[in-house]
Amino acid sequence: MKYILIVGDGMADERQPSLGNKTPLEAANIPNIQRMAKQGIVCHTQNCPPDFACGSDIAHLSILGCDPYKYFTGRGPMEAAAMGIEVEPTDSVFRCNLLSMEDREGELDEKGFVSFNAGSIEGQDALDAVAQLTADPEVAAYLKANDMEIRTTPTFRQYLIHHHGDFKGLYFEPNWEGTPGPCKQVFPRGDEAKAAPYIGF
C-alpha cells in the first residue's frame, strides 16, 4: 500500500481584513481539499515538542516518525545534506542567511533587520554577495583561524561549516525570529568563550 502525505506547512496563514477577517485558506475555493477532509480523519496534532522552537524542520522530523529529541541537531545539517553538501562527522553545520540590515550609523549589534532573506536574493546576486564577503582578507583570515568555511548556494541560504567546533551549551536563535529588532537578539547565548567565534566577524 502506498500513502501520500500532504503537509500544508504554513498554509493556514493569518486572518486578512480584506477577506472578511478570514485566512486565505478559509476564503479559498478548495473543493478537493474539503472533500478529502470530509472523507478522511481531521484532528489536531502537536508536532513540535514544547522544548523546541516551533519550525518546519522539527515538525517534519516528528511527522515522519523521527524523535526530535534524538535526531534533531539543527536545520543546517539537514538542509546541507539535501543540497548535496558533504561534511565530516566532526563538522558542525549552521544555516546562515544573507539578510538586509538598517543602513545607518552605529554598532552592528544595535542595527535592526530589514529583511531576513535580503529581499529573497537568489542566483548570481547571492553567489556574488558571498564571494565578495569571503574575498575580504580580514574575513578570510578569520574563517581560517577558527577552522570555518562557507558553502554557498544560489539562494539566500548559505551554510557555515565549523570543523571540530564545540557549541555544546550554546543556544542559537532561529534566524527568521530576528525580524524585526536589533541583530544582537539572535546572537548565540550561553558560554561567552564558545559563542565568540560565531559573532566575531
Task: List the model feature ranges, each with a label.
Residues N117-F201:
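Glycine-rich, mobile lid/loop segments that gate access to catalytic sites or pores
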Residues K2, A12-E138, I161:
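Active-site nucleophile/metal-coordination loop of metallo-enzymes that catalyze phosphate/sulfate
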